[in-house]
C-alpha cells in the first residue's frame, strides 16, 4: 500500500508539472497552489477547533482532503496511468478543480457571514441578558430603598416617641416641682397654724381637710406615675423588637442579593462556555456535511469517510475534554445552585415572616400609641384637677394668711393695750402707796392713830429712796411714775420717807431716722421690723447687724426684698427651724442671732447709713406688794411675744 501510494504521488506530481508547463505555454492562468488551499482550510479548522489537538487532527484531515482534491485516492491513481491523460482531460480536471475551489471559497464566505451573524446574535443576547440583569438589580435596589425608607420612618417615629417621652418627663418634673412647692407651702401653712394654735384653734378643721386633700393628690400622682412607667416600659420593648426585626430583615435581604448575583454570574459564565463549544462543533460538522454533500462519485467516497471519521474522532475528543474539564464544575455548580435556591427560598420565607412580624409590631405600636394617648389624656385630666386643687389651696392659703395677719394685728393691738394697761396699773399702785403713806403720816401727826400701829409696817417694809422707773416699750419711752405723781400732787415730800416697791423692767430703747424701725428684738430668736408709713419700702441689700458680748451677727436682705405699708417683717434665727418662711413677711436668716442679755441691733441701708437702732438690757423684774413677776432672760426684751413665752 505504501509503494502504491508513493507511485501515485510521483505520477500526480509529474502530471501537475506537465499541466503547469502546458498552461503557461498556452497562456492559461494556473490554478491556486495546494498550499494556499491547505492554509485556508487550516484557518477554518482553527476557528472551529481552538485546542491544539483539534488543530493537529484538522491538519491531518485537510491533508487527506487535499490529496483527494488534487489526485484522488490511491485507487484512482492506480486506475489511471500518466499516458492515458489527454490535454482536454487535464483542462477539464483543472476546470473542475477551479469550480470546486470557487465553491469552497464561497462556502468560506458564507461561513464568515454566518459567523458575523452569530456574533451579532450573541451581542444581542448579551445585551438582553444584561438588560434583564439590570432590571433585576433595579428591582432589588427599589426594594432596598423601600426597606430603607421604612427603617427611616420607624427611626423618625422612634425619635418622635423619645421627644414625646422627654416632654412628658419634663412636664412631670415640672409638676413634681410645683407639687413640692405646694407641699412646702402647705408645710409652712401648717407651721404657721401651729404657731398660732392658741389664737386660731378654730382653723384645725381646715388644716385637716388640706392634709386629706394633699394625701389624695399624692396617691393619685403615684398611681399615674406608676402607669406611665409601665406604658413607657412596654413602648421601649416594642421599639427594641422592631429594631431587631429590621436588622434581621436587612441582613437576609443582603444575603439573598449576594447569593442570587453569584449564582447568575456563574450560570452565565458556564452557559457562555457551553455555547462556544457547541458553536465550534456545529461549525465543523456543518462544513464537513456541506463539503460531503457536494462531492459525488467514487473518487470522494473514501475521502468523505476518512474526513467523517476524523470529525467524529475530533468531536469525541472535544466531548471528552469538555466532560473532563467542565463535568465536575457543572455538577458542583448545580449543587451550589440548588443550595443557593434553597437558601433564597429560606430567605424569602424569612423575609415574608419578618414582614408579617413587622405588620404585627406596627399594629401593636398603634395600640400602644392609643394607650399612651389615653394615659396622656388621663394625665392631662389629672393635671387639670391638680391645677384646680392647687388654685383652691392657694386661695385657701391666701385666705388663711389674711386671717392670720388680721389675728396677728389684733394680737399686737391687744398686747399693746395690755402693756399700756399694765404700765398704768403700776403707776396707779405706786401713787396709791404714796397716798396711803401720806395719809398714815397725816393721821399720826393729827393724833388720830398712834405711830406704834404702823411701826411693824414701817420696819418690815423696805425703805428705799424714791426713784424714777423707766418702762420703755418698743413703741417709745413713757414718762416715769415720779413725774406723773409730781404732776398730780405738788405737795413736797422732803421730810417724810415714802416706802414703796420699785418696778424694774428691761430698758429697751428704739430709735429710727425713717419710716422703717426695729419693732422688737428677741435675743437668739427673732428681729422684727415695722414700716409705719403707708408706702412700700425697698429693703434690697439692707443689713441687720447685732453686737453683743459674745460677738457680732449680721444678715443682708435680697435685692428684691420689700416691706409693705403698715406691715411687719420677722427675721428668724437660722436655729428656728419650725418657724415659717414665706419670703415676704417671715424670713429665715442665714445665721443665728445673738442671745446675749445686752444687745445693740442696727439697721442700715445699702450705702451703710444707719436707719434704726435698738438696745436691749435684761435687768427686768416687777415687784409690787410682794407679788413679784420676774422675767427670765429668755423673755427679756422680746416685746410683743415676750410676756407669753412664745
From Swiss-Prot:
Motif Nuclear localization signal per record, residues: 457-471
Keyword Oxidoreductase: no
GO CC list: intermediate filament; nucleus
Stretches assigned to the LTD domain: 504-618
Entry keyword set: Coiled coil, Intermediate filament, Nucleus
Region (Coil 2): 300-439
Residue span of region Linker 1: 127-137
Chain positions covered by the region annotation Disordered: 1-94, 281-304, 476-513
Region (Head): 1-85
Domain of life: Eukaryota
Designated name of the protein: Lamin-1
Amino acid at each position: 500500500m505504501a509503494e502504491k501510494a508513493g507511485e501515485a504521488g510521483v505520477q500526480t506530481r509529474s502530471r501537475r508539472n506537465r499541466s503547469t508547463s502546458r498552461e503557461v505555454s498556452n497562456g492559461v492562468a494556473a490554478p491556486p497552489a495546494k498550499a494556499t488551499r491547505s492554509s485556508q482550510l487550516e484557518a477554518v479548522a482553527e476557528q472551529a477547533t481552538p485546542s491544539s489537538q483539534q488543530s493537529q487532527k484538522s491538519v491531518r484531515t485537510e491533508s487527506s482532503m487535499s490529496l483527494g482534491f488534487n489526485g484522488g485516492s490511491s485507487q484512482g491513481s492506480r486506475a489511471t496511468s500518466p499516458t492515458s491523460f489527454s490535454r482536454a482531460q487535464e483542462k477539464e480536471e483543472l476546470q473542475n478543480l477551479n469550480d470546486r475551489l470557487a465553491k469552497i471559497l464561497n462556502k468560506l464566505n458564507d461561513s464568515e457571514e454566518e459567523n458575523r451573524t452569530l456574533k451579532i446574535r450573541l451581542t444581542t443576547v448579551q445585551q438582553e441578558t444584561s438588560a434583564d440583569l439590570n432590571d433585576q438589580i433595579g428591582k432589588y435596589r427599589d426594594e432596598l430603598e423601600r426597606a430603607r425608607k421604612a427603617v427611616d420612618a420607624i427611626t423618625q417615629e422612634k425619635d418622635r416617641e423619645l421627644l414625646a417621652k422627654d416632654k412628658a418627663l419634663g412636664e412631670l418634673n415640672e409638676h413634681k416641682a410645683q407639687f413640692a412647692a405646694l407641699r412646702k407651702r402647705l408645710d409652712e401653712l401648717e407651721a404657721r397654724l401651729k404657731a398660732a394654735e392658741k389664737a386660731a384653734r378654730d382653723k384645725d378643721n381646715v388644716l385637716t381637710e388640706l392634709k386629706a386633700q394633699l394625701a389624695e393628690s399624692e396617691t393619685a400622682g403615684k398611681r399615674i406615675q406608676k402607669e406611665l412607667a409601665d406604658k413607657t416600659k412596654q413602648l421601649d420593648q416594642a421599639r427594641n423588637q422592631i429594631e431587631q426585626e429590621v436588622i434581621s430583615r436587612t441582613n437576609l435581604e443582603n444575603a439573598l442579593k449576594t447569593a442570587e448575583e453569584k449564582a447568575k454570574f456563574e450560570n452565565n459564565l458556564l452557559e457562555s462556555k457551553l455555547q462556544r463549544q457547541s458553536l465550534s462543533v456545529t461549525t465543523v460538522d456543518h462544513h464537513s456535511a456541506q463539503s460531503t454533500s457536494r462531492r459525488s462519485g467514487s473518487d470522494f467516497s473514501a475521502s468523505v469517510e476518512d474526513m467523517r471519521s476524523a470529525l467524529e474522532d475530533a468531536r469525541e475528543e472535544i466531548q471528552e475534554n469538555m466532560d473532563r474539564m467542565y463535568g465536575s464544575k457543572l455538577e458542583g455548580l448545580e449543587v451550589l445552585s440548588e443550595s443557593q435556591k434553597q437558601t433564597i427560598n429560606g430567605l424569602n420565607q424569612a423575609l415574608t415572616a419578618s414582614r408579617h412580624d413587622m405588620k404585627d409590631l406596627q399594629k401593636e405600636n398603634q395600640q400602644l400609641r392609643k394607650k399612651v394617648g389615653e394615659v396622656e389624656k388621663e394625665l392631662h385630666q389629672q393635671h387639670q384637677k391638680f391645677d384646680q386643687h392647687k388654685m383652691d389651696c392657694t386661695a385657701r392659703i391666701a385666705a388663711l394668711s389674711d386671717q392670720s395677719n388680721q389675728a396677728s394685728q389684733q394680737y399686737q393691738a391687744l398686747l399693746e393695750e395690755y402693756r399700756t394697761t399694765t404700765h398704768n396699773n403700776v403707776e396707779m399702785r405706786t401713787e396709791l402707796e404714796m397716798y396711803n403713806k401720806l395719809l398714815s403720816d397725816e393721821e399720826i401727826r393729827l393724833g388720830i392713830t398712834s405711830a406704834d400701829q404702823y411701826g411693824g409696817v414701817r420696819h418690815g417694809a423696805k425703805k428705799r429712796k424714791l426713784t424714777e422707773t423707766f418702762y420703755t416699750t418698743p413703741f417709745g419711752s413713757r414718762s416715769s411714775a415720779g413725774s406723773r405723781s409730781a404732776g398730780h400732787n405738788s405737795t413736797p415730800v422732803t421730810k417724810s420717807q415714802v416706802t414703796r416697791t420699785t418696778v424694774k423692767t428691761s430698758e429697751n430703747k428704739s430709735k429710727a431716722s425713717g419710716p422703717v424701725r426695729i419693732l422688737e428684738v428677741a435675743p437668739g430668736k427673732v428681729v422684727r421690723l415695722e414700716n409705719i408709713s403707708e408706702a412700700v419700702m425697698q429693703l434690697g441689700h439692707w443689713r441687720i447687724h447685732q453686737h453683743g458680748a459674745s460677738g457680732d451677727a449680721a444678715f443682708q436682705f435680697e435685692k428684691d426684698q420689700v416691706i409693705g405699708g403698715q406691715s411687719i417683717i420677722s427675721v428668724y434665727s437660722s436655729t428656728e427651724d419650725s418657724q415659717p418662711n414665706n419670703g415676704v413677711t417671715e424670713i429665715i436668716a442665714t445665721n443665728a442671732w445673738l442671745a446675749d442679755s445686752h444687745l445693740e441691733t442696727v439697721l442700715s441701708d445699702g450705702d451703710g447709713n444707719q436707719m434704726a437702732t435698738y438696745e436691749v438690757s435684761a435687768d427686768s423684774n416687777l415687784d409690787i406688794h410682794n407679788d413679784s413677776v420676774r422675767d427670765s432672760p429668755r423673755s427679756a426684751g422680746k416685746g410683743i411675744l415676750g410676756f407669753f413665752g412664745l
